[in-house]
């Protein structure tokens, strides 16, 4: 344990996702050893993101404006919406360069253990977007875990009666992954999406 501000910084950093006590300590000492200008830039950036970052009023993606760059781009395919859990998932999909439609960010996934139900997500707003019949397909790109699967199942049952095609991203075993480390959802999806190989395939 360290005294005063240094320990307070370590404690604050360790509360961030993916950063343990040792990682927090390394970052804290880096900040301590850095020039004051660099530390001030970091502090300013943290302050700015909390004060100025917004969420798109249409799709709820993080945006610096009321409407995000994807929703206001007329070149995007208006007939398709890709539904994701978080804004970081939008970036992941964009990196594939396989999708040119619109997005809808739910703000999480259905998770009873975390006290998060459908009413806590941007599901009502998604249904409102589908009401004008411009959208013909919804791609459910929630994470391939139990919460993501539960959310996708809930949404598919909700959207299907609206006459919109609902599809789910294919998922399976990662390349280089070991079978024994695969969870039951991933392994089950791998079996469902199996390909025939060999003679006559």
From Swiss-Prot:
CDD domains found in the cross-reference section: TOPRIM_recR
Keyword flag DNA damage: yes
Entry protein name: Recombination protein RecR
Annotated source species: Cutibacterium acnes (strain DSM 16379 / KPA171202) (Propionibacterium acnes)
Domain Toprim per the UniProt entry, residue ranges: 79-174
InterPro entries per record: DNA_Rcmb_RecR (IPR000093), Rcmb_RecR (IPR023627), Rcmb_RecR_Znf (IPR015967), TOPRIM_dom (IPR006171), TOPRIM_RecR (IPR034137)
Record GO biological process: DNA recombination; DNA repair
Keywords noted in UniProt: DNA damage, DNA recombination, DNA repair, Metal-binding, Zinc, Zinc-finger
SUPFAM superfamilies recorded: Recombination protein RecR
UniProt-listed PANTHER family: RECOMBINATION PROTEIN RECR
UniProt zinc finger (C4-type) residues: 56-71
Function: May play a role in DNA repair. It seems to be involved in an RecBC-independent recombinational process of DNA repair. It may act with RecF and RecO.
